């Protein structure tokens, strides 16, 4: 048999103790607190952090009574930042708050100061968003991204359950997968390289780190079929990684948008998700575009699909909707586009209702802020629900 043409593709992830991800989680914890008391809250909450300091700032209009400082400290503590030697002390760090109300110009243009019916609500800003899906995993997500993300989540799990007590909160993962292009569909052949850089305490040796990571992190996450004697492992390749979290690097909300989405596959319009209420189409538009792309692939209409939607501020109807199935569609893309338009309402007010996006609290949005917004399980991830699509198979 002739050798199959293959290529390498890499995706990375960071876990919840990474400074940028810490900021995403604080911003979404603030959003949860606002929506829990006032589902109509307008939230644009940014967070930044550096040694011994966390600042939340932005525009928030809400009837909720929000204790910003408590949310910051609780979120940092929940991640594991409980002393300066791990990178931040949740109970003693400086917390700065600079929150103002949403601009009345934006409020009028988008919501008509709450006088508009849901279908009349305009987009909160201009922009274009993408949704992507592929049949290469049960989650309809790229394998390189799924594995990198799950390695990061597993690192946190074995830290918190004390399987690997030497672990500290900060860490990064990266997975290179060897793929075959099957007429536009992506078929994973094997895992080429696994990279893990994790923060650790002073007591552990590099050999112990490598052995524990292989046994307790890599083995449970990466299916055996993808690993072989040629798979390369880089486990803390720089040597020591004791100083981490905000003490090691500054952090900022919205800096990990590829990790939040598809690991470099598909496309990205550039807008971050965390700290934004659902009238911000950066978030809600990307969520409905994912649901549309996933439903196309799950319905068997195509093996791989990308959907783009675009908006103008204050205008409810999207300016454009685009579908590309990379040549994997069972019917022409223009027919698939019509199916998408018939089955999905891209007006912001209707996305909010159909995906129940005003329901915050109980960590709903906080959950999205680490380990990806897509390919996740649970009732809170409403955009992952596949909509059954009717289509006519072309006669042979």
UniProtKB/Swiss-Prot annotation:
Catalytic activity line of the entry: L-methionine + ATP + H2O = S-adenosyl-L-methionine + phosphate + diphosphate
Primary location: cytoplasm
Pfam families with a match to the protein in the record: S-AdoMet_synt_C (PF02773), S-AdoMet_synt_M (PF02772), S-AdoMet_synt_N (PF00438)
GO biological process: one-carbon metabolic process; S-adenosylmethionine biosynthetic process
One GO MF term: ATP binding
GO CC, alphabetical: cytosol
Key words of the record: ATP-binding, Cobalt, Cytoplasm, Magnesium, Metal-binding, Nucleotide-binding, One-carbon metabolism, Potassium, Transferase
UniProt: ATP binding residues: 18, 170-172, 238-241, 249, 255-256, 272, 276, 280
Pathway: Amino-acid biosynthesis; S-adenosyl-L-methionine biosynthesis; S-adenosyl-L-methionine from L-methionine: step 1/1
Positions with a binding annotation for Mg(2+): 12
EC number: 2.5.1.6
Domain of life: Eukaryota
Cofactor section: Mn(2+); Mg(2+); Co(2+); K(+)
Class of the enzyme per the UniProt entry, highest EC level: transferase
Binding site for K(+): 46
Protein role: Catalyzes the formation of S-adenosylmethionine from methionine and ATP. The reaction comprises two steps that are both catalyzed by the same enzyme: formation of S-adenosylmethionine (AdoMet) and triphosphate, and subsequent hydrolysis of the triphosphate.
Subunit structure: Homotetramer.
Protein name from the UniProt record: S-adenosylmethionine synthase
Organism of derivation: Triticum aestivum (Wheat)
């Amino acid at each position: 048999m002739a050798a199959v043409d293959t290529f390498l593709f890499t995706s990375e992830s960071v876990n919840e103790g990474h400074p940028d991800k810490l900021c995403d989680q604080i911003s979404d914890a603030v959003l949860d607190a606002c929506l829990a008391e006032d589902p109509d809250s307008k939230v644009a909450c940014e967070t930044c952090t550096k040694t011994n300091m966390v600042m939340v700032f932005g525009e928030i209009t809400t009837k909720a009574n929000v204790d910003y400082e408590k949310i910051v400290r609780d979120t940092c503590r929940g991640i594991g930042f409980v002393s300066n030697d791990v990178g931040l002390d949740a109970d003693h760090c400086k917390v700065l708050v600079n929150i103002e109300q949403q601009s009345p110009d934006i409020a009028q243009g988008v919501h008509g100061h709450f006088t508009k019916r849901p279908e009349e609500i305009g987009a909160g800003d201009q922009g274009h968003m993408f949704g992507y899906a592929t049949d290469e995993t049960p989650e309809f997500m790229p394998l390189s991204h799924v594995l990198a993300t799950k390695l990061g989540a597993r690192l946190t799990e074995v830290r918190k359950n004390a399987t690997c007590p030497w672990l500290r909160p900060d860490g990064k993962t990266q997975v290179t997968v060897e793929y075959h292009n099957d007429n536009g569909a992506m078929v994973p052949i094997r895992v080429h390289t696994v990279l893990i850089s994790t923060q650790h305490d002073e007591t552990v040796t590099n050999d112990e780190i490598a052995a524990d990571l292989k046994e307790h992190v890599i083995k449970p996450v990466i299916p055996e079929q993808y690993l072989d004697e040629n798979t390369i492992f880089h486990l803390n390749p720089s040597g020591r990684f004791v100083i981490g979290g905000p003490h090691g690097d500054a952090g900022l909300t919205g800096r990990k948008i590829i990790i939040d989405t598809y690991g470099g596959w598909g496309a990205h319009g550039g807008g971050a998700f965390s700290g934004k209420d659902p009238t911000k189409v950066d978030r809600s538009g990307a969520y409905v575009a994912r649901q549309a792309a996933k439903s196309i692939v799950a319905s068997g209409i195509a093996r791989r699909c990308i959907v783009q939607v675009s908006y103008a501020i204050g205008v409810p109807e999207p300016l454009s909707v685009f579908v590309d199935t990379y040549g994997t569609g069972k019917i022409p893309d223009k027919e698939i586009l019509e199916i998408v338009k018939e089955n999905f309402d891209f007006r912001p007010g209707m996305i909010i209702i159909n995906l129940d996006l005003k329901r915050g609290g109980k960590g709903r949005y906080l959950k999205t802020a680490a380990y990806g917004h897509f390919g996740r399980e649970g009732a809170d991830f409403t955009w992952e629900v596949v909509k059954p699509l009717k289509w006519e198979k072309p006669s042979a």
